[in-house]
Amino acid sequence: MFIDGKWILREDLDILNPYTLEIIERITALDREETKYAIEVATENKDVMKELNPSKRYSLLMKIAEHISSKKDLFANTISVDVGKPIKQSRIEVDRTITAFRLSALYAKELRGETIPSENEIIFTKKEPVGVVGAITPFNFPLNLITHKIGPAIATGNAVVLHPSSKAPITAIYLTKVIEHVLKKMNIERGVFNLTTGNGEIVGDEIAKNEKINFLSFTGSVEVGELISKSSYMKKVALELGGNNPLIVLKDSDIELAAKSAVKSKFLNSGQVCISVGKVIVEEEVLETFTKKVIEETKKLVLGNPLDEKTDLGPLITPESALRVEILIKESISEGGELLIGGNRSNSLISPAVLNIDEDNILSKVEAFGPILPILKAKDDEHALNIANNSKYGLQAGIFTNDINKAMKFANKLEYGGVIVNGSPTFRKDNMPFGGIKKSGLGKEGIKYAVEEMCETKTVVIHNM
C-alpha cells in the first residue's frame, strides 16, 4: 500500500482490535499484480540503496531510530491496540526497536572484506548487498520483528519489500510513515522501501515465489515456512519458525526463581511468542514444590484490557485463536492431562492455564502459541534431557541448575539453536545470534548475523599491476 513513494488507499480489509473486537482501521489488500509491481519498483531502486555509502545508511537508520524515540507513546499504544499486547510490554518492544535500529546503523559501518595472501596477484573480497530483501513478518511483535529484518537490509544497502501480518498491520503502517519522512528529508528515492499489505495467501505467496526477490526473511509458522522453503526458487532464505521450547528444572536449582521465570516468560504476550516456554520438565524430587509455586505466581496475573497499566495478559490475536487454545486444553485433558488452574475463555481472552502432563501428551509435542504452561515429571537429569531432545523442533531451551558441570552438559547436548542457563528459553538480546535447528528454521537473526546473511561476498583478483 506504500509503493514507489505513493500510498495506495482503499478499504479492502477490516482490522479489528483484539480486545474490543471493534474495527480500528480499513486498509488496502493488494492483489498479485500490485504485489508484483511493488517488487518491480524495489528492483528498479536497488542500485539507489547500493550506492548509498555506509555513512549515509548509518544516518538513515539513526534518524529512523530518533523519530521512533520521539513517538514512543504513539507506537506503544498502537502496538497494544493492534495486537492486544499489555501496554507495559509494548513500551519494552518500542525500546528494543530503537536499540535494533541503532545496532543496524553501527553495523552499516562494519561491512568489511579481507585480503587473501598471494605471491603474484592482489586478491581481496568485498561485501555487496543481495539486491532486494523480502520481509514477511508476524503479528506478535509488530514493530521489533520488522526492525530485525529491515534494519539489517538497509544497513547492507538493499531495497525492501515488507509484508506485515494481515492480522495486525497498523504498527507497520505507522513505521512506514516514519521511514517515508526520513527518506524524503534525506532526498533518497522512496521506492527503496515498499509496504505491501493484504492477505498472505496472495501477497506473501508472491514475495516468496517471485524471482526478483533476492533474499527472503520470514518469521511465522512451521507449515508456511516449509511451503516457502519448497517454493523459494533458489533465493537465499532465512526462516524463523516455531517450537515447543523446553524449560528444564533440576533438583539442585533455585526452585522459586525457576517458577517465577517459567510463569513470567510463558505468559508474556499471552504465550504468543515463538520462544515461549513450551513445556517445563522438572525432576520429580522438586516437582510438587515447583508446581505449587507456579500456581501461586499464576494467580497473581491480571487478565484484561491491554491499555490498563495493571494488565499482565491481554487477548489473543483473534477469538479463533483463543478457541483453538481452549480446544487444545480439552484435548490434553482427554489424553490424561490434569488442569490445575485457568483455561477459561471469553471471546479473545483466555485465562492462563497450568497443566500436569506426561511426555506423550499433545502439549509436549505441539506449539500451543497461547497461555498454556504444561509441567512434566522427569526421573533424573538424563531423562529430562531425553524428553527435551525428543522433538521435531529445536529453537531455544532453558535449564535451571546450580551445578556448572550439569549446565555445560545440557548446553552441549541439548539439540537447540540456543540454550539459556538459569533463565527461560524466552530470553533474547537483539544483538545475539537467534535461530533454530530441525523444523524451527534456517539461518540466523540478530542484527550482526542478519547483516551477514543479507550480503554477498565478491572476490576480486588483480593481475599484472
Curated annotation (Swiss-Prot):
Source organism superkingdom: Archaea
Pathway this chain belongs to: Cofactor biosynthesis; coenzyme F420 biosynthesis
UniProt binding sites for NAD(+): 220-225
Swiss-Prot/TrEMBL keywords: NAD, Oxidoreductase
Active site: 240, 274
InterPro entries associated with the record: Ald_DH/histidinol_DH (IPR016161), Ald_DH_C (IPR016163), Ald_DH_CS_GLU (IPR029510), Ald_DH_N (IPR016162), Aldehyde_DH_dom (IPR015590), ALDH-related_metabolic_enz (IPR051020), Lactaldehyde_DH (IPR053404)
Reactions this protein catalyses: (S)-lactaldehyde + NAD(+) + H2O = (S)-lactate + NADH + 2 H(+)
Molecular function terms from GO: lactaldehyde dehydrogenase (NAD+) activity
Enzyme class label: oxidoreductase
Documented EC number(s): 1.2.1.22
SUPFAM superfamilies referenced in this protein's UniProt entry, alphabetically: ALDH-like (SSF53720)
Disulphide bridges, residue numbers: none
Similarity comment: family membership: Belongs to the aldehyde dehydrogenase family.
Known function: Involved in F420 biosynthesis through the oxidation of lactaldehyde to lactate.
Quaternary data: Homotetramer.
Classification via NCBIfam families: lactal_redase_Meth
Protein name: Lactaldehyde dehydrogenase
